[in-house]
């Protein structure tokens, strides 16, 4: 069950430490977040502002090999993967169902989301269609953070899409399609400006172990959990959504002229 649902995941340890945040969660989270510090030698000091490095399309078999020391990524980049096709299908089916143009069945989920969840690398509970909701063995999914204008079924399909296709360049267009760019509004969602929590004492202990040649100064007098925040240079640095123009994309001038000249 979602960690945002009351009594959803009793094994969730919170998000103060990375090892706790990814423990007892969807295995795809652990598989997505880089915990091995995979870096090119010449950019070893580059870090993610969010505090999370992704390892999608990073090939661990190239560690220590010439291909892993090059700025050229030789990992194949798929144009479209089967999981995207499956997620497109189940979302379209659910949208048609809300319009009364289709009737969702358990088979729809078994052929798409459940097939993905049953992969050996994922091994997540399958979703069961129960009326207007979905359930897993632990109970009916009822996320308290669900938007009122989104059905429980569609909400979970969108969640699954986000998990399956994270870091694949699809999220922005998904939010536009759903008219949910407000999720990325840093004024309405100030938490988006926050980085990762850092336990100073534990970080220094880890750093001194991994990098014995370079030790940061330890001037702490007591253990304290601190938050590192991205400080914006000015208010205009925040991404704020304007509904009147945020969903509009202009036609390229050359295409516009070509269209009319062809006629």
Where are these regions (language model features)?
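Acidic/polar-rich alpha-helix caps and helix-coil junctions
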Residues: 3-263
């Amino acid at each position: 069950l979602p960690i945002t649902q009351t009594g959803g995941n009793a094994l969730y340890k919170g998000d103060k430490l990375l090892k706790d945040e990814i423990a007892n969660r969807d295995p795809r989270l652990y598989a997505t977040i880089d915990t091995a510090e995979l870096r090119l030698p010449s950019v070893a000091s580059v870090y993610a502002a969010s505090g999370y490095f992704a390892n999608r399309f990073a090939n661990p078999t190239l560690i220590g090999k010439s291909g892993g020391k090059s700025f050229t990524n030789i990992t194949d980049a798929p144009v479209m993967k089967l999981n995207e096709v499956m997620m497109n299908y189940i979302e379209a089916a659910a949208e048609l169902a809300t319009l009364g143009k289709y009737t969702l069945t358990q088979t729809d989920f078994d052929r798409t989301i459940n097939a993905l969840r049953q992969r050996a690398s994922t091994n997540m509970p399958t979703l069961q269609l129960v009326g207007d909701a979905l359930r897993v063995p632990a109970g009916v999914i009822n996320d308290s953070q669900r938007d009122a204008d989104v059905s429980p079924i569609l909400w979970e399909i969108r969640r699954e899409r986000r998990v399956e296709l994270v870091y694949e360049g699809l999220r922005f267009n998904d939010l536009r399609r759903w008219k949910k760019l407000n999720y990325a509004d840093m004024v309405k969602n100030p938490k988006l400006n926050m980085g990762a929590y850092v336990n100073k004492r534990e970080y220094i202990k880890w750093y001194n172990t991994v990098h014995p040649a370079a030790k940061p100064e330890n001037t702490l007098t007591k253990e304290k959990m601190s938050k590192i925040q991205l400080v914006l240079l000015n208010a205009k640095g925040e991404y704020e959504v304007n509904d009147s123009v945020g969903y509009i994309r202009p036609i390229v001038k050359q295409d516009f002229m070509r269209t009319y000249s062809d006629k």
